UniProtKB/Swiss-Prot annotation:
It is an enzyme of class 3 (hydrolase). Cysteine protease that cleaves specifically after arginine residues. Belongs to the peptidase C14B family. Transmembrane segments: none annotated. GO terms for cellular component: cytoplasm. InterPro entries: Caspase-like_dom_sf (IPR029030), Metacaspase (IPR050452), Pept_C14_caspase (IPR011600). Its EC number is 3.4.22.-. It comes from the Eukaryota. One of its GO terms (biological process) is proteolysis. Disulfide bonds join 202-259. This is Metacaspase III c. The active site is at 207, 264. The keyword Disulfide bond applies.
Length: 337
């Protein structure tokens, strides 16, 4: 990691907004620019008693890696090893998507991975959403219900989640329908119930999309990343800004949230600042070169961005840092004070 990036990370950690003090980690099936596959036959992933023949490539390969690791409890598996094994499994089956980890804190990716962090000694709660878009003329998926069923079996058998603390939304006619309103309500509920030391797990398997940025004008590429509810035609999609406001911002310090997003364009759907990609170019978590500090600060009512050195704090990418050099660091120090 370059000197300026390291300085930026140190300063950001000192003055990070209170809303990012919770321990938040997200595994996504692909980067923002990529799509995530729906697999018609998951038998090659060798899951124990899979709930069906179809499934999402990300969920299926993650479970494959985790079950194998669980069979040898004497061995440990780091974040790096997890993501690399996922990437290798996906490549072996012909998928080009690159799994990545984003987080609210700069995790040491050589530390042991656990879906429930050891520090999470409180209640274990889970919210799982699987949408096959049953009845739609286009975009019907086959594997999302199976993803949820398989993941529920895993978190119960391996991590001790109890049925009373597991919420499932699926468009199968049996569970609560994953409408826009129901998804928002479910995310709000799991946050409202959470207390320090609790472990939260949120899983989404369905369509993700990129749509034109709303009037906040925050996205560098002009697009928001979204989750696609069953009723998106009538009630719209759930934007990354919405997810941040209802799922990330309200979490209290001491809560441990792990999210699995098995959908297209999911790399930054939670707008978290730190990233590690299993593409061979990362050795540690870095501040995402596409992370927008202006967007983050805007969520906390800091509108006079230029006053605090916006040139250096907009999109922190290599070219920008190279152009402003030492002046950038001065502006960063002035901003974080």
């Amino acid at each position: 990691m370059g000197f300026l990036r390291r300085q930026l990370r140190e300063q950001f950690e000192k003055k990070k907004p209170e809303a990012l003090q919770a321990d938040i980690r997200m595994i996504s099936g692909c980067q923002d620019v990529q799509t995530s596959a729906d697999v018609s036959n998951v038998s090659s992933f060798q899951l124990p008693d899979p709930a069906g023949n179809a499934g999402g490539a990300c969920t299926s390969t993650l479970l494959n890696v985790l079950y194998k690791d669980h069979q040898t409890p004497e061995d440990t598996m780091s974040f790096v090893e997890l993501l690399n094994k996922m990437r290798e499994n996906l490549e072996a089956k012909g998928f080009s998507q690159v799994p990545q980890l984003t987080a609210s804190h700069p995790i040491d990716v050589n530390d042991d991975f656990d879906l429930v962090p050891p520090a999470a000694t409180g209640t274990r709660r889970a919210l799982l959403i699987g949408i096959n878009y049953v009845g739609h003329e286009q975009g019907v998926l086959r594997g999302c219900h199976n993803d949820v069923k398989n993941m529920v079996e895993y978190i119960k058998a391996v991590h001790g989640f109890e049925d009373e603390n597991i919420t499932i939304l699926m468009d199968d006619g049996e569970h609560t329908a994953p409408t826009h309103a129901n998804m928002i309500a479910a995310y709000k509920k799991i946050v409202a119930l959470s207390k320090a030391d609790d472990a939260l797990f949120c899983h989404f398997s369905g369509h993700g999309a990129k749509i034109r940025d709303d009037d906040r004008g925050e996205e560098d590429d002009g697009y928001d990343e979204t989750l696609v509810p069953i009723d998106y035609h009538e009630n719209g999609m759930i934007r990354d800004d919405d997810l941040y406001d209802i799922l990330i911002k309200p979490l209290v310090q001491g809560v441990h949230l792990v999210c699995l997003m098995d959908c297209c364009h999911s790399g930054t759907v939670l707008d978290l600042p730190y990233v590690y990609k299993a593409d061979g170019n990362f050795t540690e978590m870095e501040i995402d070169e596409n992370f927008d500090f202006k967007k983050l600060l805007g969520k906390f009512g800091i509108d006079d961005f230029d006053k605090f050195g916006g040139e250096a704090l907009g999109k922190i990418n290599g070219d920008a840092l190279g152009k402003v050099g030492k002046d950038a660091l001065g502006k960063l120090n002035k901003f974080f004070g």
